Amino acid sequence: MTSSSPRHADPDENPYVEAPPTDFEPVGALSEDEATEQASLLRAAIREHDHRYYLEADPLIPDETYDRLFTRLQELENEFDLPTQNSPTRRVGGEPLDELATVEHVAPMRSIDNATEADAVREFDGRVRKGLDAEGFDSDAVEYVCEPKFDGLSVEVIYEDGEYVRAATRGDGTAGDDVTEQVRTIRSVPGKLRGDPPSRLAVRGEAYMPRDAFKAYNEALMERGEEPFANPRNAAAGTLRQLDPSVVAERPLDIFFFDVLGWENDAEGDSPNRPATHWEEFDTFDAFGLRRANRVERVDDIEGALDYRDRLMADREDLNFAIDGVVIAVDDRANREALGATARAPRWAFAYKFPPRTATTIVEGITVQVGRTGRLTPVAELDPIDVGGVTVSRATLHNPAEIEALGVNVGDCVRIYRAGDVIPYVPEVVEKRSEGTYVFPETCPICDAPVERDGPLAFCTGGLVCPAQLERAVEHWARRDALDIEGLGPERVQQLREAGLVESLPDLYDLAVDDLAALEGWGETSAENLIAELAATRDPPLDDFLAGLGIPDVGATTARALAAHFGDLDAILDADEDALRAVDDVGPEVAESIRTFLDNAENRVAIDGLRERGVDPESVDVETGDALDGLTFVFTGSLSTTRGEAQAHVEAHGADATSSVSGNTDYLVAGESPGRSKRDDADAEGVPVVDEEEFAGLLAERGVAWPPEE
């Protein structure tokens, strides 16, 4: 059985492909058949839009329209309990896993022999020609395919009947970690193949983090006081090994596919339609909607491959993905089979690697930077050195544990590594010229508060008493995605602190025009403007207030989810970790991070100080209470409200609302056109099924109104 191109992807048949309407009628107005048909149209259209965006770089619709289509599909699937196995909505992540299982590969994922010298590549060519001659092939006809050697994480991805079914890391080459749910969240990995793929297809790809996205993500990590990734490869590898797929979904991973590992057209495993050459396999990738690199070439001799490598190396800084060389592979599959492989590597491929971008220099000093959350980052001050055409005078040492592992100190000769947007760092001490290892300070270099170790990291315990942390906190409060206060950039924040006008976050709201106008570089107009900006933030939306506090792991998206779930600040301040975990986008780690921040006495003083000065966030209209405490509800079908509103309503009164029926469920509330699977689960578990009228009666008995009052 093969999979044909989705019929709904044709713009003539699918209204959501070109100029799609987004003024949808209420979900509750649809029958189950109508919802199923609309969801099918939306899935096909979203896949088409993903293909146009990620593979063709030619989007048909703006991001805002795409988001509306995606949200509508989520609503339909939730309200009507529609199957979502390979729906685009699965990309937002699923339930956290207990561990990564180990799975065997369809075919060995071998490594590739490599070298940085051209002569070694020519020797490889000689072995290929000799081997082909010995097997009776015409070695003069050999052609090579040249492609980038990606510096990411290699994965095997399997499709059956065109549907995505599994993904695994390379592991030891024979078996790897099952990362099916993690890879599913990568937008450029199709959940359903286009065209006419074989009944079973296994492909090899390289998951990576684009360089621009890596830079932005690292900046966000450092802004939150978290350890940045050393390089894009570490970012990709660390992300795919996350047990929580929702964490993976939040990180900007991408993928290139570059090889076919298995191709089966029927139960006997015959493969008459598999391309005869690697070059032709690239055409099938395009036909199936599998993203591949464009910088590939086919050459008829090894000198052409060497020339390709030199040209690609010259352009590497302009690429938005990290590469560390090129792969040169025999094109013809029959030739490949004749050449075979060793236990470790194929005889028909070779990697011509780029020289490393490193240099050696002397550490002239070590300074310690203080981040917004108090994280202390040691930095090596260097004798300036040219590394790959860029003068480097500073390099990160990451954290105290890294210093201890390196054994580095002032005066040592160290190697510096730099690549693209990667922060220059010290991978090794080349020559030890000092005695001992740098001793990390026990007090903050800025405020002298004690330093506290947390695993490999170190933190200043001074909180907002620390001038550095205070300045970063004020800057964060004023950010566009928080309170959006114009006129509070780093230089002005430092000036206000040094003038003694701002010694805590609440002090911002004690500022007066006369105080500001007297400062150097200020005038009455600029002072009045800042005071007006501050006054406009005294009744901020709850989510902006939360985002502005700078709670680790809580950005704008999570702040909105918290605000929508709890409704007011006091409810959030009182919520324990279990209550926090019930919020969309909040997993165990984020819940712990929120609770730790809110339990900090200095942070509570700052929050109370803001409220005392009239900065009190607007509450979201959500009722609270414990009338339903101890009950667990599951909703299915169409109700008089959306399912999300129903869940939020019962949770606001102390109940739990889950997405699936289990032995812990007290009631399955079935609206119109309920999902069959949940009703079957309820029957199997002995869970009572009630309609909306009965549900309203249950709530009324406990003093809770239904539907929720406006």
From Swiss-Prot:
Stored SMART domains: BRCT (SM00292), HhH1 (SM00278), LIGANc (SM00532)
BRCT domain span: 623-710
Domain of life: Archaea
Enzyme nomenclature, EC number: 6.5.1.2
GO terms, molecular function: DNA binding; DNA ligase (NAD+) activity; metal ion binding
Alphabetic keyword roster: DNA damage, DNA repair, DNA replication, Ligase, Magnesium, Manganese, Metal-binding, NAD, Zinc
Binding positions (Zn(2+)): C444, C447, C460, C466
Active site: K149 (n6-amp-lysine intermediate)
Region ranges (Disordered): 1-36, 657-689
Cofactor: Mg(2+); Mn(2+)
SUPFAM superfamilies assigned: BRCT domain, DNA ligase/mRNA capping enzyme, catalytic domain, Nucleic acid-binding proteins, RuvA domain 2-like
Catalysed reactions listed for this entry: NAD(+) + (deoxyribonucleotide)n-3'-hydroxyl + 5'-phospho-(deoxyribonucleotide)m = (deoxyribonucleotide)n+m + AMP + beta-nicotinamide D-nucleotide
Xref: InterPro entries: BRCT_dom, BRCT_dom_sf, DisA/LigA_HHH, DNA_ligase, DNA_ligase_CS, DNAligase_adenylation, DNAligase_N, Hlx-hairpin-Hlx_DNA-bd_motif
Biological process according to GO: DNA repair; DNA replication
Binding site for NAD(+): D63, E64, T65, Y66, D67, S111, I112, E147, R170, E206, K353
Family membership noted in the UniProt record: Belongs to the NAD-dependent DNA ligase family. LigA subfamily.
Function: DNA ligase that catalyzes the formation of phosphodiester linkages between 5'-phosphoryl and 3'-hydroxyl groups in double-stranded DNA using NAD as a coenzyme and as the energy source for the reaction. It is essential for DNA replication and repair of damaged DNA.
Protein name per Swiss-Prot or TrEMBL: DNA ligase
Organism: Halorubrum lacusprofundi (strain ATCC 49239 / DSM 5036 / JCM 8891 / ACAM 34)
Lineage, uppermost ranks: Archaea, Methanobacteriati, Methanobacteriota, Stenosarchaea group, Halobacteria
